[in-house]
Each structure stands twice: as structure tokens, then as C-alpha cells.
Swiss-Prot record:
It comes from the Bacteria. One of its GO terms (biological process) is phospholipid biosynthetic process. Catalyzes the reduction of the glycolytic intermediate dihydroxyacetone phosphate (DHAP) to sn-glycerol 3-phosphate (G3P), the key precursor for phospholipid synthesis. HAMAP family: NAD_Glyc3P_dehydrog. This is Glycerol-3-phosphate dehydrogenase [NAD(P)+]. It comes from Caulobacter sp. (strain K31). Gene3D superfamilies: N-(1-d-carboxylethyl)-l-norvaline Dehydrogenase, domain 2 (1.10.1040.10), NAD(P)-binding Rossmann-like Domain (3.40.50.720). The keyword Ribonucleoprotein does not apply. Pfam families: NAD_Gly3P_dh_C, NAD_Gly3P_dh_N. Sn-glycerol 3-phosphate binds at K107, G135, S137, K190, D243, S253, R254, N255. GO terms for cellular component: cytosol.
Length: 331
């Protein structure tokens, strides 16, 4: 059976970009938005002027604020902010077509419960087939048709490959993996590390420090993924290392831009002011820190970011703390 009708929950930049991918892959697409102005601009101008201005949307995409509009969809892509995934899936539940797979595209750790997105989905939608999509992908580039490759993680290989085939176009290549946990851990932790890289850039600490931070951050990401039950090989791929390198290397990254502002002397409130899109790392940092503590996993960079965001320490003191750590073997 092939998929015909995709429903995308969340009409932010990434949700809109994924709607473009689905439409270009030949699917009919219903894009569910919280904001009436988004559905109005898509209907009138074929453009999401709030979150993805300047990108004309495919004709196969229709938008609605009503979750019931997804009732006939045989494939769901869930793309709300990570901290809103539970409420979004709860709203979807009475309208979810039996057997329709839910592809989780939100990256983060839920505050309070410290659960990964797949655990949240399993609680809200017991029995629903779940997959995870993650990888190096800026929304604007994907929406404009620039090429990338991503990980499509699903424990059911046959289903994972079917979903990958349904979403595949020449400029968007999903690679199947069976390690859902590894794929999720990579996506959640890299957002926190991107804030750290932004701070390094904002403080003018140089390219050497930037490269060292990405490398040591990747070690933290890997340790946490393995402690959660993921595979180191998974996070060495697109959903971990690939996503990390992209997110930590460009001010296009919402998380890195927050770090740049913090490194430049702004407060967190100033860094977030005027942003319509969510920097997931801000909400995930305290959850990642708490999760690492619960698993007894050492994550000093993530710890420092969480402390800065919580106002427990200033940027300069956090940097000094990292540079003053005892020397140890690299591996």
C-alpha cells in the first residue's frame, strides 16, 4: 500500500518545509496550523508569510486550523515544538486514521517527564506506528528545493522503508535506520550544543575553539544516546553528527543565533525577543541536564548551557569552568 494523503501538524518553518517535500513527492497534503493568519496567507498568497516568507507553496498543500482536517490522512508528520508535542498528539488522537504511521519531526526532551518524543507519542497514541525523522536540514533550504539527506528511524523496517520511499525526492533523501532512540537523542542534544557554539562565536573565541566544542559536544551526545539505549553508529550519521555540524555552523540555526546573542552580552530575554520561531535548545537544555544526571552521564557542555540559561552562572564564568576542568584521556 502506498501513502496518498499526508497530514502535517505544525505550520512553523520546518512543518511548512516538510509539507513542501510531501507535495513534491506526489502526496496530497493538509497542513494543520495553530495560527489563523498562517492558513489565511497560504490560501490567499500560497505562502506562509509568518514563518517562511518568500517561499511559494505547492498547489497540493491546503492549510487548516482544525485538527479534524487530518482525519483522512494515511501518513502524519508531527512537527510542533517539542514541548507541545503531547498536547498536539492528544488533539490528533480522536481524528487519527487507524494504522496511520506518525512520523515525529520535533527535536527535544520533554520537560518534567524527561521523555523522548517517541515515549511521549507511545503514551498518547498507544499502538500507533511511530517513526522519527531527523538530520541536517534548514527549513528554508529544504522548502526551496536545495538538497539534503536525513535519517528515517523506525523499528519496523518494512514500514520505515515505505515511509522513506513516500517522502523521497531527488533533493530529500531519507536513509532508513532501526534506532529510534539514537535518532532522537542526536536531534535533542544538538540543539543545546548549538547554543554553546553560538556563545563561542559571540565571544570571539575563534574557529579552533568552535571545532573543539563541536567535537567534545559530540562525545557528550554519544554518551547520552548510548546510555538511553541508542547506538553510537546511529549518532555518527545524519541524525547526530550531520545535524550537529549544520546546527553549530550557521547563524541560520535558531539555537546558534540565541547563543550568538548571549555571547555578545545580551540577556536570554533580549536574545529571544522578536523571534517567531522556537529555539528548541532553550527548553531542552534543563531537561537534557536533568536526564543526564538521572543516567549518571557526564555532559559538561550541556550542563554549562543549562546553567547559563537558568541564570545560575554568567557566560564568562561558565567558559572558565569548562576550561578549568581536570585533564583526562580523550576517549
Amino acid at each position: 500500500m502506498t501513502f496518498q494523503h499526508a497530514g502535517v501538524i505544525g505550520a512553523g518553518a520546518w512543518g511548512t518545509a516538510l509539507a513542501q517535500v510531501c507535495a513534491r513527492a506526489g502526496l496530497t497534503v493538509t497542513l494543520q496550523a495553530r495560527e489563523p493568519e498562517v492558513t489565511a496567507s497560504i490560501a490567499a498568497e500560497r505562502e506562509n508569510t509568518l514563518f517562511l516568507a518568500g517561499v511559494k507553496l505547492e498547489d497540493a498543500i491546503t492549510a487548516s486550523t482544525d485538527m479534524a482536517a487530518l482525519a483522512g490522512c494515511d501518513l502524519i508528520l508531527a512537527v510542533p515544538p517539542a514541548q507541545h508535542l503531547r498536547s498536539a498528539l492528544t488533539a490528533l488522537k480522536p481524528h487519527l486514521k487507524p494504522g496511520a504511521p506518525v512520523v515525529l519531526c520535533s527535536k527535544g526532551v520533554e520537560q518534567g517527564s524527561l521523555k523522548l518524543m517517541s515515549d511521549v507519542a507511545a503514551e498518547v497514541l498507544p499502538g500507533a506506528p511511530i517513526a522519527v525523522l531527523s538530520g541536517p536540514s534548514f527549513a528554508g533550504e529544504v522548502a526551496r528545493g536545495l538538497p539534503t539527506a536525513v535519517t528515517l528511524a523506525c523499528e519496523d523496517e518494512a514500514l520505515g522503508r515505505r515511509i522513506g520511499q513516500a517522502l523521497a525526492i531527488p533533493t530529500f533523501r531519507p536513509y532508513w535506520a532501526d534506532d529510534v532512540i539514537g535518532a532522537e537523542a542526536g536531534g535533542a542534544v544538538k540543539n543545546v550544543l548549538a547554543i554553546a557554539c553560538g556563545i563561542v562565536e559571540g565571544k570571539g573565541l575563534g574557529r579552533s575553539a568552535h571545532a573543539a566544542l563541536i567535537t567534545r559536544g559530540f562525545a557528550e551526545l554519544t554518551r547520552l544516546a548510548v546510555a538511553l539505549g541508542g547506538k553510537s553508529e546511529t549518532v555518527a550519521g545524519l541524525c547526530g553528527l550531520g545535524d550537529l555540524v549544520l546546527t553549530c555552523s550557521s547563524p541560520q540555526s535558531r539555537n546558534m543565533s540565541v547563543g550568538l546573542a548571549l555571547g555578545g552580552g545580551q540577556t536570554l530575554e533580549q536574545a529571544l525577543a522578536g523571534k517567531v520561531s522556537v529555539a528548541e535548545g532553550v527548553a531542552s537544555a534543563p531537561a537534557v541536564r536533568a536526564l543526564a544526571h538521572s543516567l549518571n552521564v557526564e555532559t559538561p557542555i550541556c550542563e554549562a548551557v543549562a546553567a547559563i540559561l537558568a541564570g545560575e552562572v554568567d557566560v564568562d564564568s561558565a567558559i572558565l569552568g569548562l576550561l578549568s576542568r581536570p585533564l583526562k584521556a580523550e576517549v
